[in-house]
């Protein structure tokens, strides 16, 4: 398995507020206008999943499989390999919360060198979207 980590982002909101927003994926609908247009094709969300298109991969489905005290785990479905994203959420102060996204993917060796940098960039892009969206609440 290969690990790809986003940069750690800081949200200027209390932990409870941030956790409440990211643990229910229906809340992504509020941020839809802040999500780059290329990721809103086939966009659907519900409490436990979000689906969207990523070129050239196709439709992806992220499904929450665990809600922990400071972590939310999501399976990445509709890929030709097993992958999971952990959203690590930390209380920094009464008004600040840190989030880091970690992708754990079972990428075939011959593909890893081709897509590795793109996956890392994708994790950072997701973190940037979260920062903009959550800070604007």
Sequence positions of predicted segments:
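Hydrophobic ligand-binding cavity/cleft-lining segments
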Residues: 1-44
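Short acidic, gly/pro-rich beta-turn/loop elements at beta-sheet edges
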Residues: 17-19, 30, 60-62, 72, ...
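Glycine-rich portal/gate segments that line the openings of hydrophobic small-molecule binding cavities
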Residues: 29-30, 39-80, 136
């Amino acid at each position: 398995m290969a690990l790809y980590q986003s940069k750690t982002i800081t949200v200027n909101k209390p932990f409870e507020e941030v956790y409440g927003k990211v643990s229910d994926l229906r809340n992504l609908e509020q941020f839809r206008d802040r999500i780059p247009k290329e990721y809103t094709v086939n966009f659907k969300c519900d409490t436990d999943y979000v689906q969207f298109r990523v070129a050239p991969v196709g439709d992806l489905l992220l499904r929450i499989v665990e809600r922990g005290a400071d972590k939310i785990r999501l399976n990445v479905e509709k890929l030709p390999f097993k992958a999971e994203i952990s959203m690590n959420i930390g209380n920094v102060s009464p008004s600040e919360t840190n989030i880091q996204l970690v992708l754990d993917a079972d990428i075939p060796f011959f593909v890893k060198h081709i897509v590795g940098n793109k996956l890392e960039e994708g994790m950072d892009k997701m973190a940037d979207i979260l920062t903009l969206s959550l800070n604007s609440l």
